[in-house]
């Protein structure tokens, strides 16, 4: 009986993070920005993730689950059974597709796009009253870099995963920065050597709260190398969310 009671108590304590789509208004815009939120039970920080590709997921109010890369790499950050469970996770959804460009996705520096990121940052900072971190994956890393170049005081940390070549971060940025790449990433636009050179420049300028993590597990998929497999941490999801969680909680 005691064992049954203990198991029942454990089940009650391990409660999944609340998940929902939250609409964030943008003054002057005809439509809000849809976001997907995993709300941690004991959140200490907010992590807002800007997706790669064309940045448009098609989120709609009423949705309570999000799978794929988002559910397997980001969702666990709000789950105490898998990580510290102390991060509220937000996935940003552009209301329209953002052209990927050929050499640099200039759409990621567009006024409407950056204004939407700012409104989402301010919305969740007000909602939770916690430090807000930004994470960008692939093309989304460009969005994060462009945003913090203009609004460094609104951000408390940044994570660049599988980032597209061309991302720049100024040494004057005071908050912690993590770069995350898979060693076997076959996406031509995501050259980790670019980020390694950037880290060398940042450290040479005296920045110490910057780190680079290689992922080595996982497996490829028979799909586009920039939308699957190693680039999306397929099979290495646990290594990815553990690395992210360890970096974020190091700055609690």
Provide a role label for each language-model segment.
Residues 41-81:
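Short, surface-exposed "cap/lid" segments of acyl-processing enzymes
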Residues 122-174:
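Primarily recognizes the serine-hydrolase "nucleophile elbow" in alpha/beta-hydrolase
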Residues 72-73, 101-127:
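Alpha/beta-hydrolase active-site loop
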Residues 207-252:
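C-terminal catalytic histidine-bearing segment of alpha/beta-hydrolase fold enzymes
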Residues 188-203:
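Short alpha-helix in the alpha/beta-hydrolase fold that links the catalytic acid
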Residues 173, 179-181:
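Short beta-strand/loop motif that positions the catalytic acidic residue
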Residues 19-42:
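N-terminal cap/lid segment of alpha/beta-hydrolase-fold proteins
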Residues 74-99:
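Conserved alpha/beta-hydrolase
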């Amino acid at each position: 009986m005691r064992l049954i009671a203990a198991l029942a108590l454990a089940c009650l304590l391990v409660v999944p993070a609340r998940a929902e789509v939250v609409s964030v208004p943008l003054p002057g815009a005809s439509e809000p920005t849809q976001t997907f939120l995993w709300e941690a039970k004991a959140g200490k920080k907010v992590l807002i993730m800007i997706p790669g590709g064309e940045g448009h997921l098609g989120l709609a109010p009423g949705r309570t689950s999000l799978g794929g890369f988002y559910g397997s790499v980001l969702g666990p950050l709000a789950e105490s059974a898998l990580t510290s469970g102390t991060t509220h996770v937000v996935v940003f959804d552009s209301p329209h597709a953002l052209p990927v460009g050929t050499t640099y996705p200039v759409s990621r520096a567009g006024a409407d796009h950056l204004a939407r990121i700012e409104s989402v940052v301010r919305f969740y900072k007000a909602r939770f009253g916690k430090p807000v971190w930004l994470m960008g994956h692939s093309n989304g890393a460009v969005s994060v870099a462009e945003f913090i170049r203009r609004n460094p005081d609104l951000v408390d940390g940044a994570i660049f995963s599988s980032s597209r070549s061309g991302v720049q971060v100024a040494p004057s940025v005071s908050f912690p920065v993590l770069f995350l790449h898979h060693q076997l990433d076959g996406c031509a636009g995501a050259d980790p050597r670019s980020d390694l050179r950037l880290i060398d420049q940042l450290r040479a300028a005296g920045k110490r709260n910057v780190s680079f993590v290689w992922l080595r597990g996982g497996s490829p998929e028979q799909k586009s190398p920039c939308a699957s497999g190693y680039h999306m941490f397929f099979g290495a999801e646990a290594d990815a969310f553990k690395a992210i969680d360890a970096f974020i909680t190091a700055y609690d």
